[in-house]
């Protein structure tokens, strides 16, 4: 029997804030923040190379009952399906959107798997920069 990868939870505010500085992967159901841990951080937290995940559901999404339901759906999707795709020594924070409540469970797991496996997808061109005119005479002077 194949052993399941143990997925640990982020619990402290400092851990969430550290992941916030990492890569952001946007989707229609949630925003995923991803950050690879250094070996020293893993040793300090005594987590080894297990992935860690944290969930954020803001009050904007509804009352406590609705927020907890969204959180439970995301946890189950990670536990059953998407957790196997998680990279070792990586922290994930999932910031849920209201659409995660009513989305079909299959769509939720597909979206999680897609965002977990997406490695640094960036739009072409990076930041936009406007062209500055060459310095020269003002008003023809």
Curated annotation (Swiss-Prot):
Superkingdom of this protein's organism: Bacteria
Keyword field contains Disulfide bond: no
Listed Basic and acidic residues bias regions: 114-124
Region (Disordered): 37-56, 114-141
Keyword check for Nuclease: yes
Enzyme class: hydrolase
Pfam families linked to this entry: Ribonuclease_P
Endpoints of the signal sequence: none
GO CC aspect terms: ribonuclease P complex
An individual GO BP term: tRNA 5'-leader removal
One Gene Ontology MF term: 3'-tRNA processing endoribonuclease activity
UniProt keyword list: Endonuclease, Hydrolase, Nuclease, RNA-binding, tRNA processing
Catalytic activity, reaction form: Endonucleolytic cleavage of RNA, removing 5'-extranucleotides from tRNA precursor
Function: RNaseP catalyzes the removal of the 5'-leader sequence from pre-tRNA to produce the mature 5'-terminus. It can also cleave other RNA substrates such as 4.5S RNA. The protein component plays an auxiliary but essential role in vivo by binding to the 5'-leader sequence and broadening the substrate specificity of the ribozyme.
Annotated family: Belongs to the RnpA family.
HAMAP family: RNase_P (MF_00227)
Subunit structure: Consists of a catalytic RNA component (M1 or rnpB) and a protein subunit.
NCBIfam families in the cross-refs: rnpA
Protein name: Ribonuclease P protein component
Organism per entry: Brucella canis (strain ATCC 23365 / NCTC 10854 / RM-666)
This protein's encoding gene: rnpA
């Amino acid at each position: 029997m194949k052993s399941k990868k143990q997925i640990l939870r982020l619990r402290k505010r400092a851990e969430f804030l550290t992941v916030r500085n990492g890569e952001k992967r946007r989707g229609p159901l949630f925003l995923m923040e991803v950050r690879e841990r250094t070996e020293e951080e893993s040793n300090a937290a005594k987590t080894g190379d297990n992935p860690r995940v944290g969930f954020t559901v803001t009050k904007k999404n509804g009352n406590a009952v609705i927020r907890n339901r969204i959180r439970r759906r995301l946890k189950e999707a990670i536990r059953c399906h998407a957790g196997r795709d998680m990279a070792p020594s990586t922290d994930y924070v999932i910031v849920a959107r209201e659409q995660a409540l009513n989305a079909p469970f299959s769509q939720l797991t597909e979206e999680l798997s897609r965002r977990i496996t997406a490695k640094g997808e960036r739009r072409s061109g990076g930041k936009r920069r406007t062209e500055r005119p060459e310095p020269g005479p003002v008003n023809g002077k």
